[in-house]
UniProtKB/Swiss-Prot annotation:
Protein source organism: Albidiferax ferrireducens (strain ATCC BAA-621 / DSM 15236 / T118) (Rhodoferax ferrireducens)
Ligand binding (substrate): M49, G199
Top EC group: transferase
Protein name per its UniProtKB record: Hydroxyethylthiazole kinase
Metabolic or biological pathway, per its Swiss-Prot or TrEMBL entry: Cofactor biosynthesis; thiamine diphosphate biosynthesis; 4-methyl-5-(2-phosphoethyl)-thiazole from 5-(2-hydroxyethyl)-4-methylthiazole: step 1/1
Length: 277
């Protein structure tokens, strides 16, 4: 039987984030800390970014979700992430991993494997090349950019789901969200300009953490988070272009629309297909 998911279900998760303001602990990369925090705030969540070994476990102890992003790696941060993973596993809170740049360097690949060996995440989100690399498939990554389409990574995503027994989200022109129950969602929202702002993908990962904090079904939470960002990106880009502005204005417009988006616009614009894989 095919999985079922109504647009109103997803909107109720958007409202839950706004109403409950979950605390999301992000150990993320230096490039995107500010934007990720603002995205979480605009969506209604509460961000905290702490990586000191002396406090990371305590911070996880008061958070409702943990987000790990390996964009700007160093040995200290890897150990911070491992400490956070152990604390999250002990508490049973959801963990979202963003393997930024997976496949680009041996060091990066080894760090990802260290994290996976420490504790398996609830959700892994990445572009096609990153997911293929984490799953052990051959893929060439250009920094944080993907050389593989999301559809090219579906086999790798399925393999990774089998390993983590969780959710894998492959971002691209079409976003694919798969889980161990063989549910498969495809989202076709968004705008090409979103790829020209640093941190949008990383912010998607942060949003997934916020949604997992309020929705125990991690697959549904991931679909809701990606749906929200896709629709918001579409609406924001159209408004910015209509004003004759560029991608700098889009960054601010994204935050505005995250706060202001209404149910009617969300459900009217959402392009979602749900099936089994």
């Amino acid at each position: 039987m095919a999985a079922k998911l109504s647009f109103s279900d997803l909107w109720s998760d958007v409202c839950a984030v706004r109403d409950r303001s979950p605390l999301v602990h992000s150990i993320t990369n230096l490039v995107v800390i500010n934007f990720n925090a603002n995205v979480l705030l605009a969506a209604g969540a509460s961000p905290v970014m702490a990586h000191a070994h002396e406090e990371v476990a305590d911070m996880v102890g008061i958070a409702q979700a943990l987000v790990l992003n390996i964009g700007t790696l160093d040995p200290y941060w890897i150990e911070s992430m491992q400490l956070a993973l152990r604390a999250a596993a002990k508490r049973g809170i959801p963990v979202v991993l963003d393997p930024v740049g997976a496949g680009a360097t041996k060091y990066r690949n080894e760090a990802i494997e260290q994290l996976l060996m420490t504790s398996l995440p609830t959700v892994v989100r990445g572009n096609g090349s990153e997911i293929m690399s984490v799953a052990g498939s051959a893929a060439q990554t250009r920094g944080v950019d993907s050389s593989a389409a999301a559809t090219d990574a579906l086999g790798a995503a399925q393999s990774l789901v089998q390993r983590t027994q969780g959710v894998v989200c492959v971002s691209g022109q079409i976003d694919h969200i798969l889980d161990a129950s063989h549910r498969w969602a495809q989202l076709s929202n968004g705008h090409a300009w979103m790829t020209r702002i640093t941190g949008v993908g990383c912010s998607a990962t942060a949003l997934i953490g916020a949604f997992c904090a309020v929705q125990p079904d991690a697959w549904r939470a991931t679909v809701a988070a990606m749906a929200l960002l896709g629709v918001v990106g579409e609406v924001a880009a159209e408004k910015v272009i209509a004003r004759g502005k560029g991608v700098g204005s889009l960054q601010m417009a994204l935050l505005d629309e995250l706060q202001l988006l209404d149910q009617g616009t969300f459900e009217q614009r959402l392009k979602l297909e749900v099936a089994q894989w």
